[in-house]
Design a protein with these regions (language model features):
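Glycosyltransferase catalytic domains, chiefly GT-A lineage
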Residues: 1-279
Length: 280
């Protein structure tokens, strides 16, 4: 999806190898600028790893300048996300200027539930928001955990940072803490939420279409422009489509099977059967 955009000519594509096989590496060889083998940049117990080498990517993304040192700006895009509109990429690179973190909060028009709460009786309830739950299980100080309880969750699947941003160090500090007692998966996300909401790193929040998580809210399709758009007016074009958590049909994940398609509405409110993957 990046190479198809003419604006990408002066943009390097780099990949972290967190357990690819020889065939996968060979396929990528002539399509990207660099491939670097991910390491455990923070020591993690073998009991937590359990042979899942791909979990390195949860840690190594917080150390991107170490792996790819010759660049000044970094835009991380998860492998289950793709670029639909290059204007979004430009926004991310603009957002991270002056050391800021460019990132998107998981909130916007159409989101009906921001945090899970289990009501016991009367006014008494148990907070079960993703941030709060993960913070407690990672043994994060209760005062810090409470700051995260109802803060809009920040998805770490797409973000931008300059090479010399102070955010790297803050993020790495929090990642060491979350890895100490919590699970590896999701640790980097919790760490960035701590960095933003507790340490208050300088952040440029970008619109939801810059990291559109389709499993949270399906897009619409503009049949005339042949592109995915937000489902509510003014129907902005989706910048980066993110298939986090998968798009499932008949127990098959669209990320793993190119043939999976689902029904979504177009701008005339008629159903169309589409794949949410990037066209090849």
């Amino acid at each position: 999806s990046i190479k198809k955009k003419p604006e990408s000519n002066d943009t390097a594509i780099c990949v972290l190898d967190a357990g690819m096989n020889d065939s996968q590496r060979e396929q990528l060889k002539n399509k990207v600028d660099e491939v670097a083998k991910a390491e455990w940049d923070i020591e993690v117990s073998n009991l937590k790893v359990m042979g899942k080498e791909w979990l390195k990517s949860q840690v190594s993304r917080a150390f991107l300048p170490k792996y790819f040192p010759k660049y000044e700006k970094y835009l991380w895009i998860d492998c289950d996300a793709w670029v639909n509109d290059w204007k979004c990429v430009d926004l991310y690179f603009k957002a991270c200027e002056k050391g800021k973190l460019g990132i998107t909060q998981t909130m916007g028009p159409g989101y009906k539930i921001m945090s899970k709460v289990k009501w016991l009786f009367g006014k008494l309830a148990i907070v079960k928001s993703q941030n709060f739950k993960h913070a407690l299980s990672s043994n994060i100080d209760i005062s810090k955990s409470r700051k995260l309880a109802f803060a809009p969750h920040i998805n770490i699947g797409v973000f931008s940072l300059q090479k010399n941003s102070p955010c790297w160090e803050v993020w790495q500090k929090n990642l060491r803490q979350t890895l100490k007692n919590g699970k590896i998966f999701g640790s980097e996300g919790l760490a960035i939420n701590l960095s933003v909401y507790v340490d208050e790193v300088d952040t440029e929040f970008l619109p939801l279409n810059c990291n559109w998580i389709a499993s949270n809210l399906l897009p619409k399709y503009d049949s005339i422009q042949k592109t995915f758009v937000e489902p509510y007016l003014p129907n902005n074009k989706i910048g980066i489509m993110h298939l986090a958590a998968g798009i499932w049909k008949n127990n098959i994940d669209m990320r793993l099977d190119k043939n999976v398609k689902i029904d979504i509405y177009n701008l005339q409110d008629k159903k169309e059967t589409k794949s949410l993957r990037s066209e090849e």
